[in-house]
Amino acid sequence: MGSTLPTTYKRAFFEKQDATLTLEEVQLIEPQRGEILVKVEACGVCHSDHFAQMNLMGGGFPRVPGHEVVGRVAAVGDGETYWKIGDRTGAGWHGGHDGTCGACKKGLFQMCDNEQVNGITRDGGYAEYVLIRSEAAVRIPDHVNAAKYAPMLCAGVTVFNSIRQMNIPVGETVVIQGLGGLGHLALQYANRFGYRVVALSRGAQKEEFARKLGAHVYIDTSKEDPVAALQKLGGAALIVSTAPSPELINPLIEGLGVLGKLLILSIVGGIEVHTGLLVSERRIAIHRTNSIVRSLLTNSKVGKGKSIWSWPSGHATDSEEAIAFAELQGIDCLVEEFPLEKCNEAFGRSSSTTADRERVFLADFTGLTTTAAMMDGSVRFRAVITME
């Protein structure tokens, strides 16, 4: 490696399952063939970083989390021809692919049978330096703010890519459930895509904020029935679930119109789906026998063709397109910055459930005052760890 690089660097890692993050200084490792070494400028904190803490994907320990990385190439592995020292680059959830499986042959690299995941199965960006697979690295414009664009590599590309993959015609009604890290970006992307955007959340205090982000309609679920409200609008062509609320899944299905799609992007855990709601034109009676949910259809009419979808983030090109679209359309990711030394505080933001820990300052965004923007409830934005 070049003489300008340090011999050691700081990183935050999980030593064992369910542990807090530990800071340490370790030897800098040279990139191998197919890898680039990146000096980290910023790394977003995502709820999925808990997968590393709990070893849910078998990545093992010790593990450095973080898959929303922006930085610059500091060194390249042997034979590297695409990336050069000094290039602005980044890393998202997708950390590498084999290029030979069925998904890869279709260009769906983030669905690779042998996919690597940054910060989960390989070390991530809670560090001053990180090794990234060359084929999974994302080209980042030189002029963009690292902290604001780091979350685009997961939250941003997830909502951008999944919504566009649903192939909803322009002008249709698209509902965004939840106003957190994913939801506040989904509102903006859906608005710029040309949809009639409906924000679905609890609390009247969030309406102004939702409309500033691009919602044309706001439904306060604490005051009105979301199903009735959505059906009054003609039913949704697409509902994007960005908040983990299992009890809302079936009501959301009822809020869909003909051929409507429910896109689940949040981690909701185990849910029971009333399948009759997907095919029946009326409410159905649900009976439970031996823990098996059985749907009794109340009529024999042809169903409405409703469906439930998911979409796994995106690969490097998807991320580059999400960033380019965000720049073109003025989409803004709202973040709260932390130094690496406060990594545990930043990590706590991704799982906090109390109002105090979910408050962030948004005084400079769209004219909202600090008081109005420090909203109680389930509004949650992106914590970002920044390096000196």
Curated annotation (Swiss-Prot):
Gene3D superfamilies: Medium-chain alcohol dehydrogenases, catalytic domain, NAD(P)-binding Rossmann-like Domain. The keyword rRNA-binding does not apply. One of its GO terms (molecular function) is metal ion binding. NAD(+) binds at residues 47, 198-203, 295-297, 320-322. Its main location: cytoplasm. PANTHER family: ALCOHOL DEHYDROGENASE 1-RELATED, ALCOHOL DEHYDROGENASE-LIKE N-TERMINAL DOMAIN-CONTAINING PROTEIN. This is Alcohol dehydrogenase patD.
